[in-house]
UniProtKB/Swiss-Prot annotation:
GO terms for cellular component: catalytic complex; plasma membrane. Forms a complex with GatY. InterPro entries: Aldolase_TIM, GatZ/KbaZ-like, GatZ_KbaZ_carbometab, TagBP_ald_GatZ. Induction: Constitutively expressed. Belongs to the GatZ/KbaZ family. GatZ subfamily. Component of the tagatose-1,6-bisphosphate aldolase GatYZ that is required for full activity and stability of the Y subunit. Could have a chaperone-like function for the proper and stable folding of GatY. When expressed alone, GatZ does not show any aldolase activity. Is involved in the catabolism of galactitol. The keyword Nucleotide-binding does not apply. Pathway: Carbohydrate metabolism; D-tagatose 6-phosphate degradation; D-glyceraldehyde 3-phosphate and glycerone phosphate from D-tagatose 6-phosphate: step 2/2. This is D-tagatose-1,6-bisphosphate aldolase subunit GatZ. It comes from Escherichia coli (strain K12). One of its GO terms (biological process) is D-tagatose 6-phosphate catabolic process. HAMAP family: Tagatose_aldol_GatZ. Pfam families: GatZ_KbaZ-like (PF08013). GO terms for molecular function: enzyme activator activity.
Length: 420
């Protein structure tokens, strides 16, 4: 990460796409997409997804590292070209506990990430815990971030410390996505970004972390990009110019969250304006969902009724029976809920792919379609971009490759924006 940031600060148009997903097909796609390039791939896990207690994936940081490395070995992607990152590392998962208990868990969380070889660490202690004022004072946020940084430094080996980099600050909304419709978004004021940096510098120095400050490579701000279930707020470069100019006088770049669904031109403009780390998650699993839904429609027409997977019906049944991952985000009417379950840009379906019933139905569908020749006309109907690539000889009409290429479409836009 440090080399890439140095190149950007030296005036080169270069950025990196941060892949925030634990889905094996998304990780496979991210690695396969850059297999034949010289670029490194940044893959990040969030604190609620992967932590010392397993998170919602059931994986510890060490488990996630091995999970990613196993996929890399399968794809033929060199492990040393993977940068592992930890996102929103702090009390996010334990906000219902008092600050002392939540920070104790957060300290162990950060230590486990660093021990497992994660080298990009987002120190985010911005969340109020039980009994805390809302919002927290910037000084409190910075002091807690310094505690987390001290924890990281305390377990890092000399070799790890050379690679270790920190990201500070946070965006609005909190991690997890918008829970309601958005019409506009608050762009971070330069004064607030400067205050975030100033308070963190003061807190780090007070804890004897002066050297660690040199490892702070980025600050998270809101550049004016966001999405909810059916709306996308697109980047307006002119609105972010004060931020773009301010960061030029620092050693850092910006990290932009929720950049999903922006245009490829917007990604290029974001990187030009020093938002050099672009995080993406739901857009990748949304593309995966689109591909699976398209293949399910093809299966419906090609496979005998008694042999069909019933994939779409299974997904719907499971999500309606177990609504905990979408209930507080989606609309309440039955028809509206179904539309959001299927098509929301926030893609809460991503939490359900590991469910045994859904996983088995998708596997059945894939086996069914691997056993037949899919007519080109059907691919044109349901996956038109992939049809064009089949026609030009770039792609084969194999279900797995069709899914990969659908995810590549998202990665292609980021590659354009981050181009070396």
């Amino acid at each position: 990460m440090k080399t890439l940031i140095a190149r950007h600060k030296a005036g080169e148009h270069i950025g990196i796409c941060s892949v925030c997903s634990a889905h094996p097909l998304v990780i496979e796609a991210a690695l396969a997409f850059d297999r034949n390039s010289t670029r490194k791939v940044l893959i990040e896990a969030t604190s609620n997804q992967v932590n010392q207690f397993g998170g919602y994936t059931g994986m510890t940081p060490a488990d996630f590292r091995e999970f990613v490395f196993t996929i890399a070995d399968k794809v033929g992607f060199a492990r040393e070209r993977i940068i592992l990152g930890g996102d929103h590392l702090g009390p996010n998962c334990w906000q219902q506990e008092n600050a002392d208990a939540a920070m104790e868990k957060s300290v162990e969380l950060v230590k486990e990430y660093v021990r497992a070889g994660f080298s990009k660490i987002h120190l985010d202690a911005s969340m109020s815990c039980a009994g805390d004022p809302i919002p927290l004072a910037p000084e409190t946020v910075a002091e807690r971030a310094a505690v987390l940084c001290f924890a990281a430094e305390s377990v890092a080996t000399d070799c790890q410390r050379e690679q270790l980099s920190y990201v500070i600050g946070t965006e609005v909304p909190v991690p997890g996505g918008e829970a309601s419709a958005i019409q506009s978004v608050h762009i971070t004021h330069v004064e607030d970004a400067a205050n975030t940096l100033r308070t963190h510098q003061k807190a780090f120095i007070a804890r004897g972390l002066t050297e660690a400050l040199t490892r702070v490579i980025a600050i998270v701000v809101q550049p004016g990009v966001e999405f909810d279930h059916s709306n996308i707020i697109h980047y307006q470069p002119q609105e972010a110019q004060p931020l773009a100019q301010w960061i030029e006088n620092t050693r850092m770049v910006y990290e932009a969250h929720s950049t999903d669904y922006q245009t490829r031109t917007a990604y290029w403009e974001l990187v030009r304006d020093h938002f050099a780390i672009l995080k993406v998650g739901p857009a990748l699993t949304f593309a995966l969902r689109e591909a699976i839904f398209a293949l399910a429609q093809i299966e419906q027409e090609l496979i005998a009724p008694e042999n069909r997977s019933g994939c779409l019906a299974v997904i719907e049944e499971v999500m309606l029976d177990e609504p905990q991952y979408w209930k507080k985000y989606y609309r309440t009417g039955f028809n509206d809920s179904l539309l959001d379950i299927r098509y929301s840009l926030s893609d809460r379906i991503r939490y359900y792919w590991p469910h045994s019933r859904i996983k088995n139905s998708v596997e059945t569908m894939m086996v069914n379609l691997e056993g037949v020749d899919i007519p080109l006309g059907m691919i044109s109907q349901y996956l038109p971009k992939q049809f064009e690539r089949i026609q030009s000889g770039e792609l084969s009409a194999i279900p797995h490759q069709l899914i990969m290429d659908k995810i590549y479409d998202v990665l292609r836009a980021y590659r354009y924006g981050c181009a070396e």
